[in-house]
Amino acid sequence: MAKATLKTIAEYTGLSVTTVSRALKDGDDVKQPTKEIVKAAAKKLGYRPNPSGVGLRTGINYNICAILPVTKPGDIVGDVGSLALIEGFTAALKGTPYHLTVLPMAPDEDPMEPVRYAFENNLCGGMIFNLTKTQDERVAYLHDNEIPFVTFGQTEMSIEHPYVDIDNHDMAYRAARQLYEQGRKNIRLLSSSHDYTYAWHKYYGARRAAREFGYDFEIEKNIIFDSDVDDYRKLGNKLMSGEQAPDGLICGSEISACGLLAGIQDTGKTIGDDIDVVLVETCDLPSFFMPPISGYRQDFHQVGRKLIQHLLRRINGEPVKHLQTLQKTVYYQR
């Protein structure tokens, strides 16, 4: 089906192209009933204004650029949460003049490269990115160049900026506390690289729970960074075959949990008896594990919508202090 244009709407309604154009812009010289007829026809025909044309007329870049990491060659499964994020982006942009462009960031790529590329080539009027660091060069770069942006994740910089984040401190605290309440004493937290702010938030949350129960929780002993892991199944086997085998495990994702569970079971150990496992999840996949594993759900659909909403509000000049959201996880017991 051909793309609907102003001419298509004009032919459908019997009005002139000029009248159609003015009606879609809510022109004062067009009567309200005519506006309603034109807008109903535009919706029925699937009309969407050309963002480049709108940008030329208004001087506003109506493209939003989201920079998201992609998996490295050889990975069996991609990031389960990315599709949910993108769905949230598109849902929040519906009914606005803005369009979405997703720029991939390779695992070995300098995080500044796609940000610099988007800015230097004028690809967007606003930007979204994740995997924030405590001191993040991208934040300083966009702030200095006065480009509206919002991050999925926090920093510890003096620059105040819009963000949406999961309350990882709270999540890790609740997960670790749950394991300690179940009588577990030797807990491991599988975490993302220590380069990222949220990895530290998880550590501080788990350490807080440990101290409340009278245990130590140390980076060198209790945390396993997934940047050091090549095979989660082998890791699960190695952990449970050692003399200091853990009796509690907090997994950072569905994918890591899937491999670790297989490795644990390879050793003949039983989930729920020899070790308890909880995880951070983005979907209902853990309900299909054998056995099903309880998890703390991150709603990436909601995060995606909130990121776009914050960015559009920032583009319109809303103060940063109103555009900082911390979202708690929801516990799913299985």
Residue ranges and their predicted role:
Residues M1-Y62:
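N-terminal helix-turn-helix DNA-binding module of bacterial transcription factors
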Residues A4, D29, P33, P51, ...:
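Residues at secondary-structure transition points
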Residues Y12, K44, G88-T96, H143-T151, ...:
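Bacterial carbohydrate/catabolite-sensing allosteric modules
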Residues L45-E113:
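Amphipathic helical "hinge" segments at domain boundaries
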Residues E113-G125, A206:
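Short, electropositive alpha-helical surface patch
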